[in-house]
């Protein structure tokens, strides 16, 4: 089966494509603009069936109002044809909690939000309530930040033990750059010293050391960076200090002890998957057992705020394997879990 989308204007193509894709995720879809088309949006199925949002169906209004009407009409017609509904309705390309947060800050009451969200975006009641709940949690955290004088510090370590096959980050394999790592660390410490000086009148709220894989550095190099941060930055207003410990094959007890000694409050151990065949495919040089061992080692050293990262949609993985990964990680009981979805980009 194939689906061809014809839109009368470029402005309608993005939402039309993603709404159709949500109903038919496994189907090949093409998107076309025909300015003289008789309908705002027309969906042509390979079996000859056609769904159209006709111009006569849409009331006059602003461009945004017309787009919203078109999206709703398209959704309802696709829902009738497929017999399905989408939990997040017509939402595409926006975080639901961003919309909920805006209404929360405007003073909207919970039930009024649920009604507005469902009517505006055709979201299910369950998801509307979830968006409101998460926005409330986020607001409690964000209200602790000082938006006038506060700031956050990010320290990037652009090295990894190896580069995973899916990765497009600006990082390189440690073996290829080993002769430059010490020089990078020293240059980084100079930059940290400078930034500590120019921001000393500000309030440091959070520190995040990421990458790359920060623990691809040896213990001495990690110690140098963490000591430099201790020297040049005040912790008086610090709410969170994270080191992305990263891959189990780069984490050692010595490195964790260095991190712990500098009073880092949160680490992230990132398996990405608990499927051994996938780890092998993506170029990870460690086992599922290594993940569990490293996690337990961190717990034994007193780390009480451990995040774990997963990626949905890794090459060859099924929904059942993702479910198995979530169950295995759940048994470890990390303090937080971050799930990314793999975005396959084409290179022209």
Regions found by a protein language model. Name each.
Residues 1-87, 101-102:
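A short, structured N-terminal alpha-helical element that caps or precedes a catalytic domain
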Residues 41, 52, 155, 267-269:
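Short beta-strand motif preference
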Residues 78-85, 105-153:
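N-terminal [4Fe-4S]-dependent radical SAM core
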Residues 148-183, 280:
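Canonical Radical SAM [4Fe-4S] cluster-binding loop centered on the CxxxCxxC motif
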Residues 171-348:
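Conserved non-cysteine loop/helix-boundary elements of the Radical SAM core domain that shape
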